[in-house]
Amino acid sequence: MTISALGINHKTASVDLREQVAFSAEQLDAALQAVRNLQGVEEAVIVSTCNRTELYCRGEVSGDLLLGWLTGFHKLAPNALENHHYHFQGEQAITHLMSVASGLDSLVLGEPQILGQVKQAYQAAKRQASVGGILERLFQQTFRVAKTVRNETAVGQNAVSVAYAAVSMARHIFANLQKSKVLLIGAGDTSELVAQHLKQQGVTEILVANRTLQRASEMAERVGATAHSLSELSELLPQADIVVSSTASTLPIVGKGSIEKALKKRRHRPMLLIDLAVPRDIEEQVNELDDAYLYTVDDLQSIISENIRNREQAAREAQVIIQQQTKEFNDWLKSLNSVELVREYRTHTKTLADEQLKKALAQIEQGKDPAEVLQRFSHRLVQQLTHKPTSLLKSAGENNDQYTLAVLQQLWSEPSSDSSKGK
């Protein structure tokens, strides 16, 4: 009952290659059925996101078979994934899944979205009946591990992107961030990320000012903000408790004078200004004004660097949790293997006994002496039951296989007097 994991991710493959190997929602059901039809595969789950595509399987299946299937399904050249994939089995595969779900293998260490994506992959596989008892238990335990990692370590805490760091700073400065009015200058990717993070924090009043009104309108529609032209800046600044600027301008857009005027109109209610642009959008002299608090991307970067160090330490703590849970699952899996072996051995023994008993009863019915029949029955049964152990003993002796000899010796060794006393 081997667990296997094969895939590619942001560490091993380019965006272009990851896009070619990703499974769309429309492809997923057929892909799951196709994987299940591979020789040796008993259960399967496919995790496919923008940063990774991974196959998790239970069964006796080779990495080459899985790799060949993945390459063929997406109609890639036979060696397209040769140097870009990874393949784990057993404990390594279990540890990898738990690390992925906990955010330890993500592009941004500790990001929480991956857990939801793994859950969706598991649910999709359940709907296709490609999850059985083993993967069911593995994924449920993985979800518990990810929750424990999130609750007991700081791996998902502290900002590690400039956009999120800006919002985190605003949250610490403004106790009621939800009631603050925020002005975003610029309508690029960074400004949009800031807007998304603000929305997640409950901010409802967001203004977007951009040189081209159309682009401001497009972004405002996506994030639920109001769009303005940059020419309206002097009217917008007094309304803003928080200003976040991120444009591609080569010259400052916001000067000391404009903030001074805005503060007067605000009756000197404080303003937080965060300049994410390089070169700067906001004049450095703004810091000379009372009630104006200016932070630059360099200020945020030092916070981010410290937070990354904190997350890396938390990741090491998380790995301890994952290793413990991997061992627990693997021990359970091994116990199933031994139970299955015992069941097979008993079934085999009973089959042999039943065959000999059937012959013995037939001979007795034919009038043969029961004592002689039973003696032959006993002799034949012993021969059949000892044939394989005898062959193993001979082979072990010839090859000086001390381990096998010791194991076989335990089959008929009497318990020591010391051990029997302790019972």
UniProtKB/Swiss-Prot annotation:
Which reactions fall under this protein's catalytic activity? (S)-4-amino-5-oxopentanoate + tRNA(Glu) + NADP(+) = L-glutamyl-tRNA(Glu) + NADPH + H(+)
Instruction: Outline the subunit composition.
Output: Homodimer.
Q: In which pathway does it act?
A: Porphyrin-containing compound metabolism; protoporphyrin-IX biosynthesis; 5-aminolevulinate from L-glutamyl-tRNA(Glu): step 1/2
The record's listing under SUPFAM superfamilies reads:
Glutamyl tRNA-reductase catalytic, N-terminal domain, Glutamyl tRNA-reductase dimerization domain, NAD(P)-binding Rossmann-fold domains
Positions of the record's site feature: Important for activity: 96
Protein family: Belongs to the glutamyl-tRNA reductase family.
Q: Does the keyword Manganese apply?
A: no
The record's misc note reads:
During catalysis, the active site Cys acts as a nucleophile attacking the alpha-carbonyl group of tRNA-bound glutamate with the formation of a thioester intermediate between enzyme and glutamate, and the concomitant release of tRNA(Glu). The thioester intermediate is finally reduced by direct hydride transfer from NADPH, to form the product GSA.
UniProt name for this protein: Glutamyl-tRNA reductase
Free-text note on domains in this protein's UniProt record: Possesses an unusual extended V-shaped dimeric structure with each monomer consisting of three distinct domains arranged along a curved 'spinal' alpha-helix. The N-terminal catalytic domain specifically recognizes the glutamate moiety of the substrate. The second domain is the NADPH-binding domain, and the third C-terminal domain is responsible for dimerization.
What function is annotated for this protein? Catalyzes the NADPH-dependent reduction of glutamyl-tRNA(Glu) to glutamate 1-semialdehyde (GSA).
Print the keywords alphabetically.
NADP, Oxidoreductase, Porphyrin biosynthesis
Instruction: Name the Gene3D superfamilies for this protein.
Output: Glutamyl-tRNA reductase, N-terminal domain, NAD(P)-binding Rossmann-like Domain
Name the positions where substrate binds: 49-52, 106, 111-113, 117
